[in-house]
Regions:
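Residue-level signature of catalytic and energy-coupling elements of molecular machines
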Residues: 25, 43, 75-76, 91, ...
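Predominantly long cytosolic amphipathic alpha-helical stalk/bundle segments
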Residues: 3, 57-171, 198-234
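Short, strongly hydrophobic alpha-helical membrane anchors
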Residues: 1-24
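Membrane-interface helix-boundary signature
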Residues: 18-31, 132-138
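Hydrophobic alpha-helical transmembrane segments and adjacent short intramembrane/lumenal linkers
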Residues: 168-182
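Transmembrane alpha-helix/interfacial motif
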Residues: 24-70, 74-76
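Hydrophobic alpha-helical transmembrane segments of polytopic membrane proteins
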Residues: 179-198
Length: 234
């Protein structure tokens, strides 16, 4: 940090984080800006995933309840239609096998169920992948922001020692600016990293529960399909 610029900030009596950023050393300024961007990015991902994962689980649960209550036709997909309901997509994935179940010969039952199982597995993987898309950014921000902030801290402390060496003075006016930069970089690194790590772990758990719910419903569908193929209408 430029000592004169820091002195001006104190003289004006209006010291703030923004002024510290504007008066910072170019390298530290780049670090601080990168951390601010990372923090904004992580909160954008957190907001989007909070609603995306919660909404996906709610819709899948609604279809599962409708299926067991005999109202699955309300969600039936027509050719060319798309849906954001994972439960409806699971049922659509085996719709052909579901229709054919009552007409295939006993020797074809195993092949029909195996084909349906592959379709369900692919659909579950695809749906979980769609909802989890972007969550890796939280892991990246959480693991790297602390080290980026640490780099800014080291650079700020180095500037403090350089100022001491150049001015042969250890007063607060000489070292205060670079030390403030160093602490600011550390703080921003933690501000960016901590929420990212917390929400990454939360969303990972939510996604695992979502995948387990879809897997359980897939197994229920396979059981019903197998019974339908063996016994006719249920």
């Amino acid at each position: 940090m430029n000592p004169e610029a820091m002195a001006d900030v104190h003289t004006q009596g209006a010291f703030s984080m923004v002024e510290l950023l504007l008066a910072a050393d170019p390298v530290v300024k780049a670090v601080l800006i990168a951390l601010v961007i990372a923090s904004i990015w992580s909160w954008a991902v957190v907001t989007e995933k909070f609603f995306a994962i919660g909404g996906a689980r709610k819709k899948a649960k609604e279809f599962e309840e409708a299926f067991w209550n005999g109202r699955a036709d309300e969600y039936e997909l027509r050719p060319g239609q798309s849906s954001n309901n994972a439960g409806a997509k699971l049922f659509a994935a085996i719709s052909r096998e579901w229709r054919d179940a009552k007409s295939v010969s006993p020797s074809e039952h195993a092949a029909l169920v195996a084909r349906a199982e592959r379709s369900l597995r692919a659909t579950v993987d695809r749906e979980v992948g769609n909802v989890s898309n972007g969550i890796g950014a939280l892991a990246t921000i959480g693991s790297s922001s602390v080290y980026i902030g640490l780099f800014g801290t080291v650079w700020g402390i180095m500037n403090a020692f350089l100022n001491i060496s150049a001015q042969e003075d250890t007063s607060l006016a000489v070292v205060g600016g670079p030390i403030a930069e160093a602490l600011f970089a550390t703080g921003l690194g933690l501000i960016a990293a901590i929420p990212a790590v917390i929400f990454y772990n939360k969303f990972s758990g939510d996604l695992n529960r979502y995948a387990d719910m879809l897997d359980a419903f897939s197994q229920d569908l396979l059981v019903r399909l197998s019974r339908r193929a063996s016994d006719g209408p249920i």
